Amino acid sequence: MLKKIIILFLGMFLLSACTDNFRSYFQRSANNRLVDSKGAKGGKRKPVYNNKYITLAKKNIVEDNLDDDNDDDDDYDSDSPLRGERIDPVKRNRDMYLKMIKRDIARQKAESGFAESDDDMTLNRANKKVRKDDSDKEKRMQEELNQIKAMLRETKRDISKYTCPNATVNQNYAPPVTNYEPVNYPPVKNSKPYNNNSKVKQKFIREDDDNGSNACSI
């Protein structure tokens, strides 16, 4: 039984070699695979394109970075009945890549869930965006203003702690009453006269003056 299957397979292989379409079975697909079930679409295989050059061509189309071909020999089709009509391959390729770019944009919008078209960018949407930006700015300004007010209140409290007590005079202030009797001490007898120009005395006088002037400083 196994021999019959082998003989049948070899016979089919030899008979199929006589046909012209047999060679296409071993051609590589667009995905560079020998056996590719996804390479064919509608009975036709896609041409082998290089994705790097397609991406570069799309980039040049978007940036309008095109090199026009000045050779006019290829612009005419000698076999066409419209021989005198000029064929512009640059424009044809540009239109082809523009269609590819539009399809890519539509696919990206569909994947991101953005169903609105470019025509829907109306004045209403622009006004909403501007109002949102203005409201955000006002909110930030209000927060900064509240922070400044809080800093001023805190500074005012700190200043009130270090205010000079003699700055304001209380009209109802009464000196404390003491019941101590005055004591008359006998004068101290000093054989030497007191020197008012002493350096030690002048030093203490200057220190007292400095302490008195800085009594109300913060």
Curated annotation (Swiss-Prot):
<keyword id="KW-0732">Signal</keyword>
<keyword id="KW-0472">Membrane</keyword>
<keyword id="KW-0175">Coiled coil</keyword>
<protein>
    <recommendedName>
        <fullName>Uncharacterized lipoprotein RF_0637</fullName>
    </recommendedName>
</protein>
<keyword id="KW-0564">Palmitate</keyword>
<feature type="lipid moiety-binding region" description="N-palmitoyl cysteine">
    <location>
        <position position="18"/>
    </location>
</feature>
<feature type="lipid moiety-binding region" description="S-diacylglycerol cysteine">
    <location>
        <position position="18"/>
    </location>
</feature>
<feature type="compositionally biased region" description="Acidic residues">
    <location>
        <begin position="65"/>
        <end position="78"/>
    </location>
</feature>
<feature type="coiled-coil region">
    <location>
        <begin position="132"/>
        <end position="164"/>
    </location>
</feature>
<keyword id="KW-0449">Lipoprotein</keyword>
<feature type="region of interest" description="Disordered">
    <location>
        <begin position="65"/>
        <end position="88"/>
    </location>
</feature>
<feature type="signal peptide">
    <location>
        <begin position="1"/>
        <end position="17"/>
    </location>
</feature>
<keyword id="KW-1003">Cell membrane</keyword>
<dbReference type="GO" id="GO:0005886">
    <property type="term" value="C:plasma membrane"/>
</dbReference>
